[in-house]
């Protein structure tokens, strides 16, 4: 089956990058969706465009929807995609627990793929970090620092939270109890069962995540640096190629691919 896609938020940074990479790879772009005020800026693509997903999804029910927008928009798009049978790839972060529950419920009857970071490198890291945490043991304190551009709306990043969740699970900790997002004043000694998660925002940084394992007399630093949004787009398109061969039933992630 030939891959064809529908890009949501096509005038945004990720939307433009997805279109560019898809064109470079010869992938068919059936349509784009954006706000009414932004549709004129998309005319140069010579692709079907609209602000109403029902009109587009019903016209291209086999196309894979790719969405890197906002939690509210992503939920709405997933609901419309379910209606017409479109698979959907979601790279949005910042979901509330209730919103994420909605996604998981929708995934029982429609094909939904979600990842807070579509980078292959980050997901390989997520797969290997638990082993490091277990081997090093609790004597090695875990700290996470993430850096992103000044336009990013959510903090900490979805990727930082996914890293923290992965590491806390590997040590059988409850992340809600051990996460530390801020230290100020006289906070006392650092508890052994704690994961620090710090956020930096500035400039046009695409994304940097550093994980520290700090032990007696030594420190291990692991850094993933995204130099271009193209790697996120490539990951999303890889997911799109994969999901058209899958069945509904659960929420898929990059862990299912790598």
Swiss-Prot record:
Transmembrane region(s): none
One GO location term (cellular component): cytoplasm
Record pathway: Amino-acid biosynthesis; L-lysine biosynthesis via DAP pathway; (S)-tetrahydrodipicolinate from L-aspartate: step 4/4
Keyword NAD: yes
Stored SUPFAM superfamilies: Glyceraldehyde-3-phosphate dehydrogenase-like, C-terminal domain (SSF55347), NAD(P)-binding Rossmann-fold domains (SSF51735)
Keyword RNA-binding set for record: no
Protein's UniProt name: 4-hydroxy-tetrahydrodipicolinate reductase
């Amino acid at each position: 089956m030939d891959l064809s896609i529908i890009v949501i938020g096509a005038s945004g940074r990720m939307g433009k990058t997805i279109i560019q990479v898809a064109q470079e790879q010869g992938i068919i772009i059936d349509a784009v969706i954006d706000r009414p005020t932004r549709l004129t800026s998309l005319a140069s693509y010579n692709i079907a465009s609209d602000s109403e997903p029902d009109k587009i999804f019903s016209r291209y029910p086999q196309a894979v929807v790719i969405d890197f927008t906002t939690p509210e928009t992503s939920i709405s798009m997933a609901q419309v995609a379910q209606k017409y049978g479109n698979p959907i790839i979601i790279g949005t972060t910042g979901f509330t627990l209730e919103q994420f529950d909605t996604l998981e419920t929708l995934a029982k009857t429609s094909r939904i793929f979600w990842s807070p970071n579509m980078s292959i490198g980050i997901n390989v890291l997520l797969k290997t970090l638990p082993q490091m945490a277990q081997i090093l043991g609790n004597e090695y304190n875990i700290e996470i620092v993430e850096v992103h551009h000044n336009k990013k709306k959510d903090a900490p990043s979805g990727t930082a939270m996914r890293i923290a969740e992965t590491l806390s699970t590997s040590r059988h900790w409850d992340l809600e109890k051990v996460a530390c997002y801020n230290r100020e004043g006289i906070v006392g000694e650092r508890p052994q069962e704690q994961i620090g998660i710090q956020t930096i925002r500035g400039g046009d940084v695409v994304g940097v995540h550093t994980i520290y394992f700090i032990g007696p007399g030594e420190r291990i630093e692991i850094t993933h640096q995204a130099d271009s949004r193209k790697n996120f787009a490539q990951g999303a398109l890889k997911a799109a190629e994969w999901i058209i061969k899958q069945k509904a039933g659960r929420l898929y992630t990059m862990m299912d691919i790598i």
